[in-house]
Structures are given as C-alpha cells and as structure tokens.
Amino acid sequence: KYPFSSSLAGQKSKFGFFTTEEESFRRIAEELGMKQLNGSPLKYARHPLVYLVEAADDICYQMMDIEDAHKLKILTTQETQDLLLAYFPDERKAHILDTLKIVSDTNEQIAYLRSSVIGLLIGECTRAFLDNEVQILEGEFEGSLIKHITERPATAYQHCAEVSFKKIYRSRDVLD
C-alpha cells in the first residue's frame, strides 16, 4: 500500500519497507511492473490493485460498522435505515422500501440495505477506477477511489463516517 522506504516516510510515518529491505522490494516492484517515481530509487507508484483493495476495505468496514451498531442498539432501526437509504436516488429508494415491506426481521432489512449500499459503492469505485485508469497506471492518481465517487453517495458515505466517529467508535459497548 505504501511503496516507499521508511527513510522517505517523513511526517506520514507510514511506509512499505525498511531501507534494509530495499533490494527485495526493488525485485518485487520490477516483477509487478511498478513505476518508479521522481527518479527516487526508493519510491514507487502504488500498484493499481491496491486502489481496488483499499476501496473494498473502506466500503466493507464502513458498512459493517453501521450494521453492527444497529445490532448492538447503538443506532436505532430508523437511524440505520436513514443512513443507508441516503445513498440512493428517490426512484431506487422507493424500490428498496417496497422490498423492505416484505422482510419482517429488522436485522434482515438492515442486511439487505447494507448489501445494496455495498453494491452501489462497488459500482461507484469501479467507475472511479475506469475514469482515472490512465492516471492510476501512470502513478499520478491522488487519493483513494472512495474520494472520487459521485456526490450523493459521497455525501452519504461522509455522513456515515461522521456518525461512526460520534456515536459508534465512542460507544461504551464498542470501547469495552
């Protein structure tokens, strides 16, 4: 994920390998076709697969945290539904609400919503990857794929992150 030496980590304090592992990393980077950046022998562009794995990680952790908070009763069913339905335009939201009417178990309703949001975010990140493929392959892409999704899901994702920070991660049930 961080294709540069510990000697270049600076303020980030995140790095991919120690200077003593430089030769091994060079061989791996060469084998994977990773692009060397700025003429630095110790800094490479991220492998394109890293962006997809990072997006999957971001999506799943965020959505599972919301679903788990519902199961732990940190979030009410209504709060959870509102958070997850915010990802969708009105027409799709209406279809989802119709589906929820035939599912009686609230945990199953939330699981359905969660999986619907995950599907939407996968599509958004796929689009972001394809829209930025040249920059990604050239090592010029900045940020994560999740930072390049369209406005409605981006706003909903940010709101989920804020709720997670304020209500979930600080909850006694989570901290204990």
Residue ranges and their predicted role:
Residues 1-113, 122:
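Sequence-structural signature of the catalytic-core scaffold of metal-dependent phosphohydrolases
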Residues 92-176:
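C-terminal subdomains that position terminal phosphate/3'-OH groups for nucleotidyl transfer/ligation
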